[in-house]
Amino acid sequence: MKKLFKMLAVILFVLIVFSACGRNESVSGKITSFPPYGERVVTAIGDSIAAGYGLDSQEDNYLTLFSDNIGAVLNNDAVSGYDSGEVLKSLSDEKTAADIKNADAIVVSVGGNDFFHRKDIMIDALKNALLHGEGFFPEEVTNIYDEYEKNLSRIIDEIKNMNPDAYIIVQTVYNPFLKQTLNFSYINVGKTANRYVTRLNDSIKNVCKTKNRVFVFDVAPEMNEDAENFYGTDEKLDIHPTKHGHATLARVFTEKFNGLLKD
């Protein structure tokens, strides 16, 4: 029984990670009319991933590195622990609103805490999933996904109302346990958790594909491939990126951003 609860806790912690879908997608296709190198402003909102939780120095935060790489000033308004509802409310904060209005690009990292804040529902759902099969999503869990989609859509719309010319970047959720050997009885933790991560990414994909000037940066493949990107081990449950992980995120962000700039 202890092993079962530990396994459920591991899967739940995966869902703290932040969030989006598969490819770089936007109705506009490319970034146009962007300020020159050295005159750019990036604003970040979201959760602990963007906030750089666990780092000794914010100079190692992937958003700091990314902004430096593209010649931009960074305003980081992300707050550890925020879920999508709290991020939505934060848009009315005076500093956050001002930073959004002055930004050329806004990075959004949010999603995992919507599930972590409802851990009782998720633990029950994970127990039921083990009994009923991998495709089983109880109504209570489906409601969390639905609420998240509504909040993310409102976040994007509010940003657009404040700054219609800005580009919005949403990043994917990664799974830090895919390269670890976390197994309980016949259950592979990484693969089991991936169902919930994939469903969350699908929710974000459904929202992002309807929005103009919104790009999705898929960081998951690069992050999932290297266990050194994460603090977590078989003995320590921690999904946050290490300094190495932040460097990986920064590289992926920089490559994808530069690839979207119109020639």
Ranges and model annotations:
Residues 25-80, 96-98:
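Serine-esterase "nucleophile elbow" of acetyl-processing enzymes
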Residues 17-20:
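C-terminal motif of bacterial Sec signal peptides marking the signal peptidase cleavage site
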Residues 1-6:
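Positively charged n-region of N-terminal signal peptides that target proteins for export
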Residues 88-145:
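Oxyanion-hole/transition-state-stabilizing segment in secreted/luminal serine hydrolases
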Residues 29-37, 87-106, 154-165:
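Short amphipathic alpha-helices and their capping/turn segments at secondary-structure boundaries
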